[in-house]
Amino acid sequence: MKRAIILVLDSFGIGAAGDADKFGDVGSDTMGHIAEQCDKGLADNGNRKGSLTLPNLSKLGLAMAGKESTGKFSAGLDANAEIIGAYGHAAELSSGKDTPSGHWEIAGVPVLFDWGYFTDKENSFPKELTDRILERANLPGYLGNCHASGTQVLDDLGEEHMKTGMPIFYTSADSVFQIACHEETFGLDNLLTLCQIAREELEDYNIGRVIARPFIGPGKGQFERTGNRRDLSVEPPAATILQKLVDEKGGQVHSIGKISDIYAGCGITKKTKATGIPALFDATKEAIEQAGDNTIVFTNFVDFDSAYGHRRDVAGYAAALEYFDGRLPEIMDMLQEDDILILTADHGCDPTWPGTDHTREHIPVLVYGHKVPAGSLGRRDTFADIGQTLAEYFETSDMEYGKSFL
């Protein structure tokens, strides 16, 4: 029986990519800089202290993959761990350093076209676009229209939004149109309807995602984003390994978290919503228990990116990694004879880096299974090597990009 479990540690890069200069990211290193700060005692909080401790990920080769990526071991990680899995690092072919590009490339379909972006920091959106959205949604106006941090924009505009009923429109360096609205005063259903309108109106702009950002709270300093985020993505430009498994093998793909949204539902046969790393772990375990032959269980752990990377919270990121590492054996112990477990990322988001955006980095490729030989996979030229490996594993037709490392 063949089953693959893919765990994406969203934003967990392991060193600047060779083309990082094109993105202003030379020297970025999400893992390395977190480990360095921890080792210096600069990432202590109520949940953790001291050096970054990831014994289970190190056994799977994480520390070695980081060394192969950057030329040096990350501070404090166990460089002498007994390696029980295959490990490597992968560079990105895709033109961007965003979530859809990274995930699609992991599934064998790199994004070789250029996304559309809203590059102006203020007055970011064309008036004709916002006019059409407001007219269709029957709204009197909007707030924002700028590049913004998702939490800061709530403090800046949340109270005015609650008073006026006008949605908050904002963007970032990614190919996104984000809409923040209060779940209680504006309504979650109204927000999702508004986002669908925006998705349709953005078709000519080649924008990757419209993101619904619902929040709650009584006022400034007390607003919190909820777990009802929704990503409305465009469809991948070609069949991913997910789609091929379903179409060619009658297989199953169980999405946990926001995976289904990222692939616009393409190739997804079942989806489970879960919020927060503990709940995502629990949902993943339940999916593995239920998984039959020719099944992919695919989980995105978004909190590494959204709660810690973008917010430049080194201590929070480190604590989340250590929690993840502590629970990893629960999944490893569930693997059957022919199963494979793949741990990877979709881009970097170095919490020590200037600004709040993603960073162009190599991603880890850690593979574990009873029949997977331990050792180095070396440098992979594209994330699509993962998709091609899955194509060989499940015996589907080949992907156009990538080389299998089986």
Curated annotation (Swiss-Prot):
Keywords: Cytoplasm, Isomerase, Manganese, Metal-binding. One of its GO terms (biological process) is 5-phosphoribose 1-diphosphate biosynthetic process. It holds the Pfam family Metalloenzyme. Binds 2 manganese ions. Its EC number is 5.4.2.7. It is found in: Cytoplasm. Its cofactor is Mn(2+). The keyword Isomerase applies. GO terms for cellular component: cytosol. Its main location: cytoplasm. It catalyses: 2-deoxy-alpha-D-ribose 1-phosphate = 2-deoxy-D-ribose 5-phosphate; alpha-D-ribose 1-phosphate = D-ribose 5-phosphate. Belongs to the phosphopentomutase family. This is Phosphopentomutase. The lineage of its organism: Bacteria, Pseudomonadati, Pseudomonadota, Gammaproteobacteria, Vibrionales.
